[in-house]
Every structure is written in C-alpha cells, then in structure tokens.
C-alpha cells in the first residue's frame, strides 16, 4: 500500500512572499488598533470634538511602536502650546508583537529547517511593508482641535483679543519610522529566540540550545507579571470603583506598570517626576513617589515605594520566586551536557537583556506648557489639558505647565539583573539536576531532525 506523502513547504514565490509579509503587517496593526481603540474608548476619548478619534487612535499606535507625538497650538497671537509625548502604551505594543509573531510563525509551520536566504527574504519583505505602513500611519496621526471658550461673552471677548484656542498634534516621522523599524526587528528576534516552532538555518541550530531555554523561561516571567497585574487591576476596579478608567489603564499600560514592578523587585531604580494630573489612575505609591516636592527628581525604588505602602516589599520575594522558577525551567529544558556554570552564565545574560529591554520600554516623557507672550502660566497638568479636550468647561484653565518623566537607571539595573540571573540559574540547575529530568529530548521536538541515535540533547 502506498504511503501518504508528507507535505514539505518550499520557499514562497514572489507574489506569495509579499502576501505573507502583508498579512504579518496588517495583522499587527489590526491588533494594536483594536486594543488601543478599546482602551481609548474606556478613557473617554470617544468624546473628542471634530471627529478626532481616528487620529488619536493612530497617534496611540505611533507611540506603541516607539514613535513620538508632538502637541502644538495656542490661542491666537497671545498664547502657544509647546508639548511632546514619548511613552509606549505597552499593552498595545504587546498585542501587536504577539499577533505578528504568531502570523509569521504560521507561515513557517511546515518547516523543519529554513534556509538563511529564505528567512532573510521574508524579513526583508516584512520590513519594507512595515516601513510603508509606518509612513502612512504618521500621515494619519495628526489633528487640530478648535476648543470653545465657553459662553457668548467669552467667545466675544476671545474674538476681540484674537484668542482662537487650538490644540493639535502630529506624529514625529523620523522617530516613528526609525524606532518603529527597530521595534519590528526586536519583535522578530524575540520570536526566533523564544519559540521552539521557529525554524532556523542549519548553521544556527546548535545555538538554539544556548538561547531558547532561558529566553522562553524569562518570557514566562514577564507573562506571569502581566497575569498578576491584571488580577490586581480587576480587583481594584471591583473594590474601589472607577472601573472604566482602571480598565483603560489595563488596556493601555498594564505591562508598563507590571514590568516596572519586576525591575523594582530586583533592586533596579527609575528616576522620574510628575507635575499636574495624570488623568488615569495609577498605583498610589507610584504617584506619590513621583510627586516630589518643588518639582525635584524622584527615585522609584523598592525603598521609596515601601515608604508609601509597606506592601511594596512583597515585590522582592515575588521577583526572587519567579526568577528561581524560571531558572529551574530553563535548566529543565536544557541538555544534560550543559554544565552548571554554563547554565548560570546563560541565564544571567538572558536576565540582563530582559531588564535592559524592560527599562527601555518603560521610559516615558510627556511635557507641555502654555506660554502667554513668552511667559509660562498656569499650574494645571497634562491630564487637565486632555480633560478639557474631553469636555471641560474652560479649556484655557488647564493649559498650564505639566510633565511626566520616567527613566531607568540602566547602569545599575542591568548588572543587578545579571547577578540575580547568575544566582537563579545556578540554583535552578541544581534543582533540575535533582529531578533527574534534564537531558534527552526527542528529535521531533527540535527543528533539524535526528542527531546521532535518533535523539538530540534537549531543546528550548
């Protein structure tokens, strides 16, 4: 009886290759737009005047891929708004990254080993279409709002003085395209580093055993923090009310807060400052620390958060337990031939890279101010400005100075993460060795087929 043939996919044709790349790009943008739209709707942005919601949605996606949005406008000849926002809504970013990775991998699902030329071709086509999409996105992320002054008398006086308040925004094209390209490359690199389904060229197959176990384990740590943060956010919405705005924070910035907690639990620090109103609820200890007196720079650390809420000390054992579990899992999925010191070093490097990326992703800068005849006025905040656009009675009342800055101290955070990773990797390897489960994995679990005796030494 004739045996059924097994389908083996070959390199895509030119048209199929471009369609595959288009599917990856469109899927990513669709996922980011859906999450951002729901989050903005919950935040109240659906009430923006002048049909500005689509442009604001495009601006949110611009920020999600690492771009920047500039605010501008003013009130005739007398006042001007000078502002800029550069902060990643990581819930939106994560949605796009996960969907793009899944679509990219599904196109390679019949591969055991992929040729280097084919993978580079797929990546190059995706990059080209991604850059085109980013350029179009920057065109859509611009809008100007004409803000009413209020009653008839205010309108009359404003017209006589030449006060025609307008507040607009536009995406910064160079940063959006440049950083957006880097964002895509990081997503694709992470996909190949984490997923066992991602085929590699034969020359790179030996290296996957050194990278994938640790990368996958730390990815699970980040996901665990998201689950914990989601549970805490939902509980807060139920107990303390304000459910709509709390859910908006979860849909826009859950990873920003959860992964910040991960870094703080490891001993990392962030420097920041907050003046004015945020507009959306954030954990009270974080907001209190950022509101340093006299506008001074604040330090976000385990100690400063615990000064506001003693429960913050739980971030330390939480980070220790999850990192130790990740070290065990990485060793459990590694080959028997990997020595303890090798596993510890690999896990230390992976931990350092993870915290480096978390630090870069959680940076935030949002500054604006209204000047009248060159002199800054007002004590409002960024939340007041946004609130006025969402229906406030007197928009000019909120056009004061406001800022939010958040920057990681990477020169201490990265070495700390490496030290934690070294310890967790070594202890994890010892625990895995006691289980007797480190070692052989069947060849079907690893792209590349059989190796000596039908088995290969473990896989990530």
Q: Where do the protein language model's features map onto the residues?
A:
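Cytoplasmic membrane-interface segments at the C-terminal ends of transmembrane helices
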Residues: 3-19, 97-124, 138-146, 185-217, ...
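Loop-centered beta-sheet repeat module
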Residues: 201-245
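Selective recognition of specific alpha-helical transmembrane segments in multi-pass small-molecule
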Residues: 26-34, 126-138, 217-233, 353-354, ...
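Long, glycine/tryptophan/cysteine-rich extracytoplasmic
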Residues: 4-95, 139-173, 233-319, 357-444, ...
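Long, low-complexity, intrinsically disordered cytosolic termini of multi-pass membrane proteins
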Residues: 445-460
